[in-house]
Every structure is written in C-alpha cells, then in structure tokens.
Regions:
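Membrane-embedded alpha-helical segments of integral membrane proteins
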Residues: 30-79
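Internal/C-terminal transmembrane anchor helices
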Residues: 82-107
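Blade-level signature of beta-propeller repeat domains, shared across WD40, Kelch, NHL, RCC1
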Residues: 403-405, 500, 524-558
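Extracytoplasmic beta-rich repeat domains
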Residues: 173, 179-192, 204-207, 223-248, ...
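Loop/turn-rich, solvent-exposed surfaces of beta-rich toroidal or solenoidal domains
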Residues: 403-405, 436-507
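Aromatic (tryptophan-biased) beta-strands that constitute blades/sheets of beta-rich domains
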Residues: 121-183, 209-236, 272-281, 285, ...
Length: 558
C-alpha cells in the first residue's frame, strides 16, 4: 500500500508518525549512498598505480567524510530526540579527538602516513629516558683502517655495496649470530664503521649526540653532545625527532651534520670537538620540513654539505682541518639527499640533488656547471635518493611520490682546456634518455649490478634494465618491505625492511627470489644498515643491534 493510501485510512493523530516512517528509508538510503560513493572513489584510487602514501591519505580522508556524513544524518534525519542526537554525533567523533593533537594518544606513523604504533601523549618519548652524556675515554683509541670499512653514508661507492665477501643463503643451517642489541637515541642516522669502531648520531632528550661504539660489543666509548633538538610540528612531525645524516669518518676525524644544521669535526680517537659551524644561522638559510639530512662529503682538503641558502650558498665547502669556509655556491633549497663526487666528461664535479634541480658544481671551486630540473618540494614531495653515475656520462635519478625515474645523458661541448665553468666557451647540457614509472624510491636508494637496477619502488622490490628502463619484475611480499633500505653483497641483496626485518634476496634479473629472513629489530626502521665484513649494524629510532652474518666461500676465479 502506498504512503498516500495509508494516509487516507490513518487517524489524524497518527499521521505525523506514519509520514516520518515513510520518509526514513529515503534518509537511510541517502546515507548508504554517500558511503557507497566514498567506498567506490577510494577503491578506484587504491587500484590506480600511485604512491602508497597517497592511497593511505585517501583512505583517511574517506573515513573522515564517512563520519561527517553519519554525524550529519544523525543531527538532521535520524529522528532521535534533540539531546540524544547531539550526544550520538559527539560520540562518533570521540575516536578522532583521541588521536588529534589535543587528544591523549600520539600515533607513530610509517613512511606511507600509515599507523605503525602509538603511545600516550603525556608519556616521555623513548629518547627522553636515555642517558644524556658519556665520558670521553681516558686513553686515545687506536683506529686502524681496514679494507672492509664502511666509513660513510652508503659505504664506499655511489650505491650501498660491499665487495670481497659473500653471504650464506641458508640461514636455517647457518644462522646469523646476534652479538648485541641495546637501546639508542632517536633519529634516522646510520652507522659509519672504521676498524673496530662505529659512529652514529642520536637524539637523547634536548641533546643531539654523536656516539662512538665498539663494533663487536656495543660498548659506548665516547660521545659528543650539542644542545639541539629537531622536533617539528605540523607535517614535519611525521618524520620524528633527531638527526638524519650519517657520519663520515676520514683520516682520523669524524664529520657530522645535525638535523638543525650543526656541522662538527671530531677527533675520532678521543671524541674531542675540533671545530663546529651552526650553518643555518651563519649563512641565513632556513631549515626544511623534515630537518637537514645530507651526510658530509670529503673532497680533497674540504668537507662539503648542502646548507640550502638561496644567496650563492646552497652548497658550502669547509676546510676539513680548520673549518674555514673554502667556497660557497648555488642558489637552491636543500633536499634530503647527500652530495656526491664524480667525474663527467673528464671534469671532477660534485652532484647535489636540491629541492627541484640536480646541480653540478666544479669540485675545486664550487662553480655551477650545469643543472637539470628534477621535480620536488622539500616541504612536500621531497627528494631523498642519491644521484647515481652509471658510466658514459650518464646519471640515474629516482625518488618517491609517484615521480618517474630518469636516466639522463650529460654532454660537454666547446671545451677550451681550462677548468670547466671558468669560461663562457664551456657549455653543458643534460638530456633525458628515458623516464619511466619504475624504481620510485622514497627514503631509499638503488643498487646496480650487471646493467640491472634494483630498488624498492614505493613499498615493493623492483628490478629494471638500466639501458631502457624496462621493468623485469616487481614483487610485493608479506610483510611488505615498506620504505626499507638495501645493500648489494656479491650476487645477493641484503634488505632491511621498514618494520626491522632482515631479508636476503637474490640479485636475479629474471625473477624475485627470497633466500632468507630474520626479524632484526622492532619498530619503524628507515635507517641505512652498515656492513663491515661479516658484521652487520642495524638501528632505528629506538634500538640498535649487531649481527655476525654467516659468510660463504668466495667464488673461485677461473
């Protein structure tokens, strides 16, 4: 019977109630339709080949809009008495308030803006519970360099690779041995290893620290502290607190770059501070959302960092013995990548991935030689991956946020025999060979073997041909690698996942082959591992560990 027909036979005193009963299904249908529309839009986004963080954000927005639709329906169309409507709407938004900046719960995010953990907002952060300072050693340490050192960010090359060792593939028969595991301060710094010692950077309360450990025992032997703490609000808070860069150990000195721009030179044997610069203050540069992250680069007698100033002081070189400024050049904001030294067209130059350009500087003078546009925003779709020279004056570029990787060709013409960049006759150009949606690294970097590039594309292991950019395979495992880090060791890739799992993968261009795995540490892990011979150091913002990995005999040379 229709609503009209029922109304004709309904007593007047019941008309209002019956009409409401007829209208209510339409109101429910509107709410269900709104939810269905949001679900469909979210599904389309998740089925599209875009960055995982965009997918997660779309889901969060959809949930907020769904709650908004439900609360609007309760207030306007539910038929509940007025006090009950307001209480019900408030109850719906209570979980949102709980995790808001005003609520009692602080969420710990992973690299895709997903939720990895939580803690009570009033509880002290992990780094605030640790010992702040460590006394310097009473005797100077004996630092002995070896051919297995891992002395800086990514070791000794353009990508993380350890040569001269091979790893056992069967970790059931040959288990990695845990030598030590202990709490460390916050931050995303990696370890630099020389001889029997390893150095990293940590945040402990209000002190940004440089800490030296015994490699095989984890014993702290010296530390240096600066009164600094990078703990940004807003979107920057997603990156957490503490230093990001990895120390550089060179010629008995430890060079460090803190998240607030403090550049230190420290005596490796004693932990004594030799010289220091507060670079952002001295050069009038502003920090970037997630803090200064580039690791110091040694170039001859200088140590070079990206200051990010806009007035001919984007890249700055300091005399590594005295700390005096040697030169400053460039006018771009920093990214989160580190400068590298290479040679292109017979000219030594420093490559710096800036906010939205790849810039090449003459190694001796800092003069800008050439630039190549590279889409980025250091407060948004930031660049954090290294430029990779691959031979033939070509450079491989990659980053996250859905930006395509590129292989570019650099050419120098009209050479006059003088140092490049000192005469107008020197002309440089950079042209794109290919640009494809492969190997879209975000926090990590790629490795290269036999003309094949391996890396983590968003959250999946990826493999592509260097010459063409053609993808050979892409693999999503469970649990996912997330925004982890990788090291090439012979014919194997050692991956440290975002959740702290150690995964051994064959460097096979034909298919993904997982050889072994081990849960190494717990918590969000963006730090690069360091491998010295069989000794692997891993860490995150809460704990560090050293494993002795089983070695396999090196293949014989015929």
């Amino acid at each position: 019977m229709s609503c009209v027909a029922r109304a004709r036979t309904t007593p007047p005193e019941m008309t209002t109630t019956k009409k409401q009963g007829c209208q209510r299904p339409q109101r429910v249908a509107f709410l269900l339709g709104w939810w269905g529309l949001l679900a469909a839009a979210t599904a389309v986004i998740w089925l599209t080949d875009i960055a995982q963080d965009y997918k997660n954000v779309s889901l969060q927005i959809a949930l907020v809009l769904a709650l908004g639709g439900l609360s609007t329906w309760i207030l306007r169309s539910s038929g509940l008495p007025s006090p009950h409507r307001w209480w019900a709407a408030a109850l719906i938004w209570t979980p949102v308030w709980v995790i808001s900046p005003m609520g009692p719960v602080k969420l710990i995010n992973n690299g895709n803006t997903g939720v990895a953990d939580w803690r009570w907002r009033w509880a002290p952060a992990h780094d605030e519970t640790l010992t702040r300072t460590v006394a310097a050693p009473t005797v100077q340490l004996a630092w002995k360099e070896t051919d297995r050192d891992y002395p800086r960010f990514l070791g000794n090359g353009y990508w993380a690779e350890v040569k001269g060792v091979d790893l056992e593939a069967d970790w059931n028969a040959h288990q990695p041995k845990l030598l030590w595991k202990q709490p460390v301060g916050a931050g995303w710094s990696g370890f630099a290893i020389v001889g029997d010692y390893a150095v990293t950077q940590e945040q402990r309360g209000d002190q940004e620290m440089v800490v030296c450990y015994e490699l095989k025992t984890g014993k702290v032997v010296w530390s240096h502290a600066d009164e600094a703490r990078w703990d940004p609000a807003g979107p920057g808070a997603l990156g957490g607190v503490g230093p990001r860069a990895t120390p550089t150990i060179h010629d008995g000195h430890v060079y460090t770059h803190g998240a607030t721009g403090i550049l230190n030179c420290i005596d490796a044997r004693s932990g004594k501070l030799l010289w220091s610069h507060d670079t952002l203050a001295e050069f009038g540069a502003e920090n970037i959302s997630w803090g200064k992250s580039d690791s110091p680069l040694i170039v001859d007698d200088n140590v070079v960092i990206s200051v990010g100033g806009l007035n001919n002081n984007s890249l700055v070189a300091f005399n590594r013995e005295t700390g005096d400024v040697a030169w400053a050049a460039g006018s771009h904001r920093s990214s989160y990548a580190s400068p590298i030294l290479t040679e292109i067209a017979g000219v030594r130059q420093i490559l710096a991935v800036n906010e939205n350009f790849l810039t090449a500087h003459a190694a001796a003078t800092g003069v800008v030689l050439w630039e190549h546009p590279w889409d980025g925003d250091s407060n948004g779709n930031a660049s954090a991956s290294q430029p990779v020279p691959v031979g033939g004056d070509r450079i491989f570029l990659s980053k996250g946020y859905g930006i395509q990787s590129q292989l570019i060709q650099v050419t120098r013409t009209a050479t006059n025999g003088e140092e490049a960049g000192t005469d107008d006759a020197d002309k440089w150009s950079a042209e794109i060979i290919w640009s494809k949606p492969v190997l879209r690294t975000k926090f990590g970097n790629v490795v290269l073997r036999d003309g094949v590039v391996y890396g983590i594309d968003d959250i999946d292991m990826d493999c592509a041909e260097l010459e063409t950019g053609k993808r050979n395979w892409k693999k999503r495992r469970r649990p996912e690698l997330g925004h982890g880090q990788i090291i090439l060791v012979g014919e194997k890739i050692l991956a440290l996942s975002e959740s702290g799992e150690l995964v051994l993968i064959a460097a096979d261009s034909k298919k993904y082959r997982e050889l072994a795995k081990l849960q190494a540490i717990e918590g969000v892990t963006w730090n690069n591992p360091a491998l010295s011979g069989q000794y692997l150091l891993v860490r995150n913002a809460e704990e560090a560990a050293c494993f002795e990995l089983p070695l396999a005999p090196l293949p014989s040379i015929q």
